[in-house]
From Swiss-Prot:
Protein name per its UniProtKB record: Phosphate acyltransferase
Assembly mode: Homodimer. Probably interacts with PlsY.
Gene source species: Exiguobacterium sp. (strain ATCC BAA-1283 / AT1b)
Keyword Cytoplasm: yes
Catalytic reaction annotation: a fatty acyl-[ACP] + phosphate = an acyl phosphate + holo-[ACP]
Pathway: Lipid metabolism; phospholipid metabolism
Entry function: Catalyzes the reversible formation of acyl-phosphate (acyl-PO(4)) from acyl-[acyl-carrier-protein] (acyl-ACP). This enzyme utilizes acyl-ACP as fatty acyl donor, but not acyl-CoA.
Length: 329
């Protein structure tokens, strides 16, 4: 297994990226793998990474959050992101991981690595925490604000295969995000997509409302990127608000502090459940190789989780399974 890693992408790069790589390789001390850290050699070396399985690939440019994505990918040929994507295109790496500019990662993936034949619109897909602890794969959350009904079918197939082979769910339950659970609910897109999803080679269980998205009753939720991104931001905001409110209440007086001390193990588990860092990054599905978008504010734990996610996708040959499913379709 070989991973190309954009060492300069993200708010805390390259330190968080290098520290995440350290944690990742430490988890697999005896496993054969090759990791390519792409970026500023001097800065990367300053964090003391010493593992024969890690190679630093020099890149003199950085694509920042202020750069226009497509223009940056075309003009900054020696940027860490573009060089990493080229490694995947040339077959020197099996997957790409980056915490950098989302739009630039999408552009590099499309223009350099390329789309899977038959997939018109790739989808960005994180895993949300659920009440049951199993997680739910949601796609699309922003790669494409608009979509056709046929695209949602592609999302369902890709999400189902990912949930099965990466999340370990035997028969993933696929649902369509909607404003009601009845089959006739929704706008023109959801009404057109519903019967197509019923005929798709997935275990489609109908519509799901946003309030039930994290119940654990479904394993995959499909939607267009506009609604998906609103759902994502709502979940992130609600989780953040909940943790802040709990912290405020449990530190308000001595009795509350004692209660927090007693409940500390359970509170820690709750925090881990809601912590995006534990769930890896968002997979960009529909690309010719696994591409993982780590959160821009990723720390070492989040990077390690994203690398694990990429490893599982490579180990289980998820992209090839998607290609075969589309060929049959």
């Amino acid at each position: 297994m070989k991973l190309a890693i954009d060492a300069m992408g993200g708010d805390h790069a390259p330190k968080a990226i290098v520290e995440g790589v350290k944690r990742f390789v430490a988890q697999y001390p005896n496993e054969s793998m090759e990791l390519f850290l792409v970026g500023d050699e001097v800065k990367i070396a300053s964090y003391g990474l010493d593992d024969p399985r890690v190679t630093v690939v020099p890149a003199s440019e950085i694509i920042t959050g202020e750069d226009e994505p497509v223009r940056a990918v075309r003009r900054k040929k020696d940027s860490s992101l573009v060089v990493a994507a080229q490694l995947v295109k040339e077959g020197k790496a099996d997957a790409l991981v980056s915490a950098g500019n989302t739009g630039a990662l999408m552009a590099a993936s499309l223009f350099i690595i390329g789309r899977i034949p038959g997939i018109e619109r790739p989808a960005l897909s994180p895993t949300f925490p659920t009440y049951t602890g199993s997680g739910v794969v949601v796609l699309d959350v922003g790669a494409n604000p608009d979509a056709k009904a046929e695209h949602l079918v592609d999302y369902a197939i890709m999400g189902s295969l990912y949930a099965e082979h990466v999340r370990g769910i035997k028969t993933p339950r696929v649902a369509l995000l909607n404003i009601g659970t009845e089959a006739g609910k929704g706008n023109a897109l959801t009404k057109e997509a519903f019967p197509l999803l019923e005929q798709a080679p997935v275990h489609f269980v109908g519509n799901v409302e946003a309030r039930e998205a994290m119940s654990g009753d479904v394993d995959v939720i499909v939607t267009e990127g506009f609604a998906g991104n609103i759902l994502l931001k709502g979940v992130e905001g609600s989780s953040s608000m909940l943790m802040k409110m709990m912290k405020e209440q449990f530190t308000s007086d001595l009795v509350s502090k004692l209660a927090a001390l007693i409940l500390k193990p359970k509170l820690r588990r709750l925090k881990e459940t809601l912590d995006y860092r534990e769930h890896g990054g968002a997979g960009l599905f529909g690309i010719n190789a696994p591409v993982i978008k780590a959160h821009g504010s990723s720390d070492a734990l989040a990077i390690m989780s994203a690398l694990k996610q990429a490893k599982i996708m490579v180990d289980h040959d998820v992209v090839e399974k998607i290609k075969r499913a589309k060929a049959i379709d």
